[in-house]
Each structure stands twice: as structure tokens, then as C-alpha cells.
């Protein structure tokens, strides 16, 4: 036993909500290097669907500094953040999301 029993909340990531698989190139394994607007369009579409159809949805996307930090990518992330802010998104850490979920359950 490692301690008293407790609750576990998993906040899963999704490959289609990560930047790495869309923009990085690994020869023989990963095509990557897709146009930056493709990623932005996909992320916006998924977010807009969640806003319209999934009350209380958690949109947990994953970004990597070596990928999203490039000039042409960081501007797309900024566009996504503005898009989300305009639609009332709550930006929170995973700990804050876990706490809010705990209070709601």
C-alpha cells in the first residue's frame, strides 16, 4: 500500500489535439510539416463542436515548445486562444480542472 485510498481523475490527451504529430517530421515514421492553418482549422472545429454540443467539455490540447514555438505556429496558437476567449472559454491548469470536477461530482 502506498497511502490511503483516494479518487483518481484522468484528463486524457488526444493525438488530434497535439501539435507535435501535425508539424514535426520524423523520416520513415511521421509525415508532419502540415500547413499551420490546417492545425488551427482542426483545433477550432473541435472546440466549436464542443461549445455547441458538449456543455462543460474539457478541451485539453497538448503543445510542445519546440513545435508550437516556431513563428508560424505560435501565431496560430494566439489565434486559437483569441477564438476561444471570444466564446467564453475558461483557461485553467489541469489541477484547477480536477478541483472543479471534484466539486461538481
Task: Mark where each language-model region is.
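Active-site-adjacent pocket scaffolds in enzyme catalytic domains
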Residues: 1-55
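C-terminal domain-boundary segment and adjacent tail
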Residues: 40-105
